[in-house]
Amino acid sequence: MFMNRLFGKPKQETSTLQTLDKLNETLEMLEKKENVLLKKATGEVEKAKEFSRAKNKRAAIQCLKRKRLYEQQVEQLGNFQLRIHDQMIMLEGAKATTETVDALRTGASAMKAMQKATNIDDVDKTMDEINEQTENMKQIQEALSAPFGANDFDEDELEAELDELEGAELEEQLLQPVPIHVPQGNKPARAPAQKQPTAEEDELAALQAEMAL
């Protein structure tokens, strides 16, 4: 019943947070009361010691009775705190569960919306369009890369013209005069070039002429 009340309400998250805050405030209040009672119990023990030293047994026993009452209240407050802790843990767990379910529900709704916006037929159609555009682009690129005016010439005519050029070149080579070969031994011998005397040779000749005198 508690989980059913927790789900499906628009302001449930705010209410849960407020409840947790209230429980936390109550827990702090109980802890403060527990500390006060513990101090009172400790004070009764000190009083009992003083009365015991004063040989006032009856007063000392009364102090111990009050100490027992304070301890019972402390134990009761401890049980209250334990229950509040349990309740807070349950609420926090329920809050986490609610947030998880809401997140899953939101994700499922988003997935459902995307599936409605995109189905298998749309995917197939899109892929066909992409393939068609790709093929068209290939044809355009092939047309642009072909040599300009390449289909305007006849291959047979070009080959005939090439044969004609080769025949004319061969005929021109046949009509060129044959060079006359002169034997090496029949060539007229050249007179050896007269060597010009150097400056040292001139000085040597002049010295020899002086010595002859």
From Swiss-Prot:
What does the organism's lineage look like at the top?
Eukaryota, Viridiplantae, Streptophyta, Embryophyta, Tracheophyta
Source organism per UniProt: Arabidopsis thaliana
Q: Which keywords has UniProt assigned to this entry?
A: Coiled coil, Endosome, Protein transport, Transport
**Quick check: keyword Protein transport in the entry?**
yes
Q: Which InterPro entries match?
A: Snf7_fam
| Spans traversing the lipid bilayer | none
Is Transport among the key words of this record? yes
Q: Name its GO BP terms in alphabetical order.
A: protein transport; vacuolar transport; vesicle-mediated transport
Q: Where in the cell is it found?
A: Endosome
Recorded protein name is Vacuolar protein sorting-associated protein 32 homolog 1
Write the signal peptide boundaries. Answer: none
How does this polypeptide assemble, per the annotation?
Component of the endosomal sorting required for transport complex III (ESCRT-III), composed at least of VPS2, VPS20, VPS24 and VPS32. Interacts with SKD1. Interacts with BRO1/ALIX.
Superkingdom assignment: Eukaryota
Q: Check the record and name the Gene3D superfamilies matching this protein.
A: 6.10.250.1710, ESAT-6-like (1.10.287.1060)
Q: What does this protein do?
A: Component of the ESCRT-III complex, which is required for multivesicular bodies (MVBs) formation and sorting of endosomal cargo proteins into MVBs. The ESCRT-III complex is probably involved in the concentration of MVB cargo.
Please give the residue ranges the record annotates as the region Disordered: 180-213
Question: What single Pfam family name could you report for this chain, choosing any that match?
Answer: Snf7
Q: Which family does it belong to?
A: Belongs to the SNF7 family.
Instruction: List the GO terms this entry assigns under cellular component, sorted alphabetically.
Output: ESCRT III complex
Coiled-coil positions are 11-42, 118-176
